[in-house]
Amino acid sequence: MRGGGKKNGSNVEPLRATRPCAECGRPSVREHYPFCSERCRNVDLNRWLSGSYAIPVADDESKADDGDER
């Protein structure tokens, strides 16, 4: 057991600390972590599926040419 002491039923440790919702900033809940609700979770999913989230890529032609030669 953690802490080396006795553990009673009234001293339950949460699985993780509450963090702000990744979408709106309200406290997250366990069922929808890291979001506060199903709505915020679905808004984020929609952004991923619609392509709103993208990793920017800088085109460097000199590196692209070097990659072709082996």
Curated annotation (Swiss-Prot):
Inhibits all the catalytic activities of DNA gyrase by preventing its interaction with DNA. Acts by binding directly to the C-terminal domain of GyrB, which probably disrupts DNA binding by the gyrase. Interacts with GyrB. Its cofactor is Zn(2+). Pfam families: YacG (PF03884). It comes from Rhizobium meliloti (strain 1021) (Ensifer meliloti). Zn(2+) binds at C21, C24, C36, C40. GO terms for biological process: regulation of DNA-templated transcription. GO terms for molecular function: DNA topoisomerase type II (double strand cut, ATP-hydrolyzing) inhibitor activity; zinc ion binding. InterPro entries: DNA_gyrase_inhibitor_YacG (IPR005584), Znf_NHR/GATA (IPR013088). Keywords: Metal-binding, Zinc. The gene is yacG. Signal peptide: none annotated. Binds 1 zinc ion. This is DNA gyrase inhibitor YacG. Belongs to the DNA gyrase inhibitor YacG family.
